[in-house]
Amino acid sequence: MRKAFAVITVLALFLAATPAMAGGQSAVKEARQGTAKFHQISHAEASGYGSTLDLLGCFENPGVGGMGLHYLNAGLLDGTVEAGEPEALVYEMRADGQLKLVGLEYLVPAELVDPTNPPQLFGRHFHPHPILPFWIMHAWIWRPNPSGMFMDWNPNVALCPEGVPVFGS
């Protein structure tokens, strides 16, 4: 009897999770389709994204992972989120000055968020940024992250090149 109950419970949990997982996968596909053109930085700039290097610097957390340079489209900071139209693009900064699109960041200004009902995307809730006034979610759709697709730091992203300003320092 216990075994049958356990099987039914697992099956019920699986069936309940399947739509969210499927929705998350279709949103990842939408994100990839909507941002593929931004591998060329000129397309990102033409679409309203701009570098945050002078304002925020490059993001890294030695021993945990990199986050790179963010290109922000301030016009998208409107409280809505769409998988194929992220508020920020995340680029790995290479020592030779080249930028490589590695991920996306979705941001909602904190004043537009009810903390008891945070924004969601990919079947996951956003979390508050520890310093900046935003609720955020990263999606490492262009560089696999062994820590998880939606973790903040990616150990597969290089740390900031020497001489580049680093956020928080």
Report the location of each language-model feature:
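Positively charged n-region of N-terminal signal peptides that target proteins for export
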Residues: M1-A4
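Bacterial N-terminal signal peptides
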Residues: I8-A16
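Sec/Tat signal peptide C-region and signal peptidase I cleavage site
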Residues: T18-A22
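Primary mode marks residue(s) on the alpha4-beta5-alpha5 output face of response regulator receiver
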Residues: G23-S169
